[in-house]
Amino acid sequence: KERKELVSVSKKNHLSTFLAGAFLFGHFFCWFNAVKLTNIGSAVVLAALHPLVVIVLTVFVFKRKVSMRQILGIVLALLGGTMVAGFDYRELSQGNFIGDILAFLAAIFMGLYFAIGNEVRKEVSGKVYVFLVFLACWICFTIGVIATKTPVLGYSLKDYVLILGLTLVCQIGAHAVFNLCFGYVDSLYVSAWESGESVFAIILSIIFLGQFPTQWEIMGCAVVVAGLLYYNYFSSKQEK
């Protein structure tokens, strides 16, 4: 079934999917370089702005209605994420400006990737879209590795294990779920809930690392959850 659909995918959807994969590559490229060039607080907060990019695309490009209450919920969630990251506005000037720009570009690429995926998934099944968008991303990665002459050999076994785990669980696993979700909810919904990753990061750090959050981080998590629940409530009301 998937093979037949793969052959029948229109040129427009093939092009859109490749573009989405290229934006996903752009997100990864900018994000991983950003964390090397600037402080983590700046990188996390700036890269998490992708819901705002999706809002702009949803309203001005796809001409869909987004209520002010939905936007408020997303802003609250982003504010909570900022609190969890321990972000201080002074960090922007202390970090490397190029790193800050790359982190912001990572947010833009993520927003574009989500928005395009949402449109393509209306005509292409989840499995086929996931295969095509990851293939496009890997092609871009291969070109990037060759163009930048980045070595892929010579690292330690521990490094390769960590890279494999990051790739399979955090990248392929998470983004496969995102892309499958587009068949049931819109990109703004997915983008908004993805911004709640800081809460799960805190929970996992307690379970696996024994690191307990500060009061400030707990407050931030509460704001994130409140913002997402607020957004979810008014999104559900709008659908009705």
Which residues are covered by each model-predicted region?
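A helix-boundary/kink motif common to multi-pass secondary transporters
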Residues: 39, 65-67, 125-126, 186-189, ...
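Non-cytosolic membrane-interface motifs at loop->transmembrane helix junctions
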Residues: 42-46, 98-101, 160
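Membrane-interface interhelical linkers
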Residues: 1-19, 32, 60-72, 89-98, ...
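Hydrophobic residues within alpha-helical transmembrane segments
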Residues: 15, 19-22, 49, 71-78, ...
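Hydrophobic/aromatic residues within transmembrane alpha-helices
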Residues: 34, 46, 60-62, 66, ...
